[in-house]
From Swiss-Prot:
SUPFAM superfamilies listed in its UniProt record: PP2C-like
PANTHER family referenced in this protein's UniProt entry, alphabetically: PROTEIN PHOSPHATASE 2C, PROTEIN PHOSPHATASE 2C 47-RELATED
Record EC number: 3.1.3.16
Protein name (record): Probable protein phosphatase 2C 47
PROSITE patterns xref list: PPM_1, PPM_2
Binding site for Mn(2+) 1: D111, G112
Cofactor: Mg(2+); Mn(2+)
Length: 361
């Protein structure tokens, strides 16, 4: 098991990033109007299930009610071809210190831009802001929404941080069997459900229809996939040089979209990754890779490393960060596909037609 990111006990004051990046990159990213690869092209990783569908996140009825998830995670990062690393992540497999005897875990991926300040600050503070919220744990949705907004506003108030720094935020909060995914930006969470890919978050890109409508309603414009010609994401924390003042209406939103599911024994693992992964790999391809890796060595850290390595081989042009969370101590079982017992036949007319075609070859 990979070592988890150390998280200090909750305190009343927010932690500010200690080190500031000296050479800040541009706050924008390459245009996102080019479709991401939706197939698994590597010959080393052929998918068990063709296509890259959204299978729906509802848990099937009649599952084993005695299932109790056991959390173990692994992560891997690489700055890729960029000069600096602006991604951050957090992995906490055991929340006993924070929530008592209940089973719980917390994970996050934060894809920074315009320097590492916003991503580093969010990593250090967002989990404790969730758990310090008055609605936690009775309403994790309200607590999580509040934590995203509070983190965003704290970035505006922190004088030691670069106001032009911003970050996407993707978090997974698990209490007992209930998992809440919160996303603001274009990082993505994908559930591996017996080999099937289930996307639990939506990529918030300016060209997405719903995001475009929201942006234009608030007076924003989109140029070549960029919000106001500056950012390739429609939602982010920070970026106060774009948002202006707190309380003002701005097309760049910090509000997360939420997806909540109840884990079952069919839910094997969760993949969380920044857009550097998903720009070059489909969700289904990633799920298939992780499942086959787990069946070989059952190590989520090595799975994360394999995904990052594959993305680099596919010429990803961004920082890469991947977190893989397993829900069982055991490796996924082999999927047995029953053979069909139906007999196939062909008519005499069809046989003659087939012979004619073959004779012409």
């Amino acid at each position: 098991m990979a070592p988890v990111t150390e998280v200090s006990p909750m305190i009343n004051t927010l932690e500010v990033a200690d080190d500031k990046m000296t050479n800040l990159s541009s706050s924008g990213k390459p245009p996102r109007n080019i479709s991401a690869m939706r197939h698994c092209n590597s010959t080393a990783w052929l998918t068990d299930y063709e296509g890259d569908e959204r299978f729906g996140a509802k848990s099937p009825e009649g599952v084993n009610s005695t299932f109790q998830p056991v959390f173990r995670s692994g992560s891997w990062s690489d700055k890729g071809p960029k000069q600096s690393m602006e991604d951050e992540f957090i992995c906490v497999d055991d929340l006993t210190e924070y929530i008592g005897s209940s089973t719980g875990a917390f994970y996050g991926v934060f894809d920074g831009h315009g320097g590492v300040d916003a991503a580093s600050f969010t990593k250090k503070n967002i989990m404790k802001l969730v758990m310090e919220d008055k609605h936690f744990p009775t309403s994790t949705k309200k607590a999580t929404r509040s934590a995203f907004v509070k983190t965003d506003h704290a970035l505006a108030d922190a004088s030691s941080l670069d106001r032009s720094s911003g970050t996407t935020a993707l978090t997974a909060l698990i209490l007992d069997k209930t998992m809440l995914i919160a996303n603001a930006g274009d990082s993505r969470a994908v559930l591996g459900k017996r080999g099937r890919a289930i996307e639990l978050s939506k990529d918030h890109k300016p060209n997405c229809t719903s995001e475009r409508l929201r942006i234009e309603k608030l007076g924003g414009v989109i140029y070549d996939g960029y919000l106001n010609g500056q950012l390739s994401v429609a939602r982010a924390l920070g970026d106060w040089h774009i948002k202006g003042t707190k309380g003002s209406l701005c097309p760049l939103s910090c509000e997360p979209e939420l997806e909540e599911i109840v884990l079952t024994e069919e839910d094997e693992y969760l993949i969380m990754g920044c857009d550097g992964l998903w720009d070059v790999m489909s969700s289904q391809c990633a799920v298939t890779m992780v499942r086959r890796e787990l069946m070989q060595h059952n190590d989520p850290e090595r799975c994360s490393q394999a995904l990052v390595k594959e993305a680099l081989q596919r010429n990803s042009c961004d920082n890469l960060t991947v977190v893989v969370v397993c829900f069982s101590p055991e490796a996924p079982p082999r999927i047995e596909i029953p053979k069909s017992h139906k007999r196939r036949s062909i008519s005499a007319e069809g046989l003659d037609l087939l012979k004619g075609v073959l004779n012409e070859l």
